[in-house]
Amino acid sequence: MRSDMIKKGFDKAPHRSLLKATGLKDEDFDKPFIAICNSFIEIIPGHKHLNEFGKLVKEAVRAAGMVPFEFNTIGVDDGIAMGHIGMRYSLPSREIIADSVETVVNAHWFDGMICIPNCDKITPGMMMAALRINIPTVFVSGGPMAAGKTSKGEVVDLSSVFEGVGAYQSGKISEEELKDIEDHGCPSCGSCSGMFTANSMNCLCEVLGLALPGNGSILAIDPRREELIKEAAEKLKILIERDIKPRDIVTEEAIDDAFALDMAMGGSTNTVLHTLALAHEAGLDYDMSRIDAVSRRVPHLCKVSPASNWHMEDIDRAGGISAILKEMSRKEGVLHLDRITATGQTLRGNIAHAEIKDKEVIHSLENPHSEEGGLRILKGNLAKDGAVIKSGATEVKRFEGPCVIFNSQDEALAGIMLGKVKKGDVVVIRYEGPRGGPGMPEMLAPTSAIAGMGLGADVALLTDGRFSGASRGISVGHISPEAAAGGTIALLEQGDIVCIDVEERLLEVRVSDEELDKRKKEWKRPEPKVKTGWLGRYAQMVTSANTGAVLKVPNFD
């Protein structure tokens, strides 16, 4: 066993003595040592219940004849961090989480690991660590939140609250109505109830094969999630016995399948960023053009909030992720069904008995929302290395208009609220990329303000930053190269005409190459917004969005 490094031999007497101080007995040194990587944090509703989950996982690990050791990671609630400097720490927290998990697990030579994540950057951070460490691992998330209902019976979620702010600002609802939405938008523990980033990543974790069937859709408060925890411990023991590791599971084909599910569900654009980072950790050269190839062959089968009024509980009721995958498998070439997963079975085996139970929620191949996926990769002179749009969250497929430029999210939100943006405009928010932000903050407040004011179909928004999974409308993010790297987005001037063509996958500014070259020569890189602390270091090390915004290792040659 890997853990023999710290528990076997006469020279490990000091190690055993320390371990006995934690409560271990001599007989425990013949059992596998299991890291329980938890993320219990009281300020995050998706993680508030995970202390109880941790106890259940430890009980299940002991029952399976192994020895559990629980530790915790940090986390950031993107909703609470939204709209202020806290959002700059969100994406960078992914790297801290990955590094901290790597540190604890490799320092103590565990034989296997069960990860308990739930929300936005915590799930991908742990997944990155699992691929980096590469010991048998199973994920079991905290589960989605239920949708809420206002006093009038209207189904609401967190995106409803953000959009309610814009609706109140424009006089469309009263303060009392906004308070009603606020009070009922987040009714329980769990990850926010729509197809936002947290749920998108937990669903992708399931299809990748690192989590068990049901992980993405079973609600946090559903007793079936406790059964999932017990099964996770049993499956981990099998993975250890068979020496099946994360890098055996997360292959190029698995990543194709993850993006295929993402396209079928119209998941968060953040999944592109995080899954590219996973490919990097797995040692795979996975190009963004491959994502677009997946999008072209995968139909969009279900729309979940914010693209519809359906929520994760509806997906679960309709058959869950397995039902979506089973339907997708009917189309040749969409999924790689014979690859191994954390169940010890193939993907084909995992979904063999699944079926769609509500075709209003999960459409059939014969009745898709669209023939192509709900995410698209755009390229052009404004995004030479690519950009991402959640095409499933807007009916508008082509938009052209003059750009209104803001050099920060705060500046943009103030401008939108003051009426500086009108129908037909293309809002540009730049210098908010991985390096320029720093931290590539999400633009949920501006998109929600635009939607809440009734301009969601009449105003486009471009940024080198990110969008929340709760964002909708004509929102193009992850523009690469970013402004801070001298990308074309930095060269735009007020009134330049920008064209977004979703069907043709184009993002262009109607300015000649000669004029852009002239502007590039005159452009000067702004001073970094942050020069000290973690964000200062992050800005110096982070790479572009088109490579997953991972940190580059300095070259010491």
From Swiss-Prot:
Protein residues bound to [2Fe-2S] cluster: 119, 192
InterPro entries (UniProt xref): Dihydro-acid_dehy_C, DihydroxyA_deHydtase, DiOHA_6PGluconate_deHydtase_CS, ILV_EDD_C, ILV_EDD_N, IlvD/EDD_N
The protein's required cofactors: [2Fe-2S] cluster; Mg(2+)
SUPFAM superfamilies (alphabetical): IlvD/EDD N-terminal domain-like, LeuD/IlvD-like
Keywords: 2Fe-2S, Amino-acid biosynthesis, Branched-chain amino acid biosynthesis, Iron, Iron-sulfur, Lyase, Magnesium, Metal-binding
Pfam families noted in UniProt: ILV_EDD_C, ILVD_EDD_N
Gene Ontology cellular-component terms listed: cytosol
Enzyme active site: 468 (proton acceptor)
GO process annotations (BP): isoleucine biosynthetic process; L-valine biosynthetic process
Enzyme Commission (EC) number: 4.2.1.9
Positions annotated to bind Mg(2+): 78, 120-121, 442
EC class: lyase
Gene Ontology terms for molecular function: 2 iron, 2 sulfur cluster binding; dihydroxy-acid dehydratase activity; magnesium ion binding
Pathway annotation: Amino-acid biosynthesis; L-isoleucine biosynthesis; L-isoleucine from 2-oxobutanoate: step 3/4; Amino-acid biosynthesis; L-valine biosynthesis; L-valine from pyruvate: step 3/4
Catalytic activity: (2R)-2,3-dihydroxy-3-methylbutanoate = 3-methyl-2-oxobutanoate + H2O; (2R,3R)-2,3-dihydroxy-3-methylpentanoate = (S)-3-methyl-2-oxopentanoate + H2O
PROSITE patterns xref list: ILVD_EDD_1, ILVD_EDD_2
Cofactor stoichiometry and binding remark: Binds 1 [2Fe-2S] cluster per subunit. This cluster acts as a Lewis acid cofactor.
Keyword match Signal: no
HAMAP family xrefs: IlvD
Stated name of the protein: Dihydroxy-acid dehydratase
Source species: Bacillus cereus (strain ZK / E33L)
Protein encoded by which gene: ilvD
